[in-house]
């Protein structure tokens, strides 16, 4: 008998519809790191235990900088999640990634400036300093399931890899920044993937993201610079693809034995912690 799977789902802009979960119950969770963005909704998708959390709150009232990423991830861990699937709206930095396309990212570049990126900050709950390695940045096996599920569903415009630049926000990039990110080899830009992906790894959770390209940011010379109205319209038009992918991937994830993967992840975390020593 393998490890029992329980999947946390962090919904970004447009994907905070709790109706995708059956037999839903709301849980208020307070963590050592504060209160999560919203109540957590527990239930089942395709018979698999899941927990849904709206990253920005159900009323989208929390800007990216102010999201309590630590509380969100720790709350999912507290409720017994083994995996975290997230959706995120992104700007495309590549001609071949069109608005409405989906990317399953495999790497990131951090351009945030105001966010705590570790649980090991000197608190009494977790002792030491954690130098977590971020290669691979995302759970490879979980990504593989998402990619295979998208292929089986015949979802158009799916890209199997990509590097996401996470900026502080809430402002969008300048044209100079957007072109710099392109020179760095990045494919997408967003505001929420970091520190979420880092904290999930520290917590020993199998984390993968579904990134929806909603615009071309502002690097192109053809005048279609990013704006809120276009972002929301594109995400709303295409969010059913993200929902369909998540709903169909969940039972495939649950059908696999994750014991070794989770044990290896726990080992990585444990061997990354430097404990204080006495002189």
Swiss-Prot record:
The superkingdom of the source organism is: Eukaryota
Alphabetical UniProt keywords: Cytoplasm, Glycosyltransferase, Nucleus, Purine salvage, Transferase
Q: Name one GO molecular function term.
A: S-methyl-5-thioadenosine phosphorylase activity
Top EC class for this record: transferase
Q: Which Gene3D superfamilies match?
A: Nucleoside phosphorylase domain (3.40.50.1580)
Under CDD domains, the record lists:
MTAP_SsMTAPII_like_MTIP
Q: Name one GO cellular component term.
A: cytosol
| A Pfam family that the UniProt record links to this protein | PNP_UDP_1
Q: Where in the cell is it found?
A: Cytoplasm; Nucleus
Could you tell me which InterPro entries the record lists for this protein? MTAP, Nucleoside_phosphorylase_d, Nucleoside_phosphorylase_sf, Purine_phosphorylase-2_CS
Which residue numbers mark the site Important for substrate specificity? 173, 228
GO BP of this protein: L-methionine salvage from methylthioadenosine; purine ribonucleoside salvage
The residues that the entry says bind phosphate are 13, 55-56, 88-89, 192
Q: Does the keyword NADP apply?
A: no
User: What is known about what this protein does?
Assistant: Catalyzes the reversible phosphorylation of S-methyl-5'-thioadenosine (MTA) to adenine and 5-methylthioribose-1-phosphate. Involved in the breakdown of MTA, a major by-product of polyamine biosynthesis. Responsible for the first step in the methionine salvage pathway after MTA has been generated from S-adenosylmethionine. Has broad substrate specificity with 6-aminopurine nucleosides as preferred substrates.
Q: What is this protein called?
A: S-methyl-5'-thioadenosine phosphorylase
Ranked from the top, the taxonomy reads: Eukaryota, Metazoa, Ecdysozoa, Arthropoda, Hexapoda
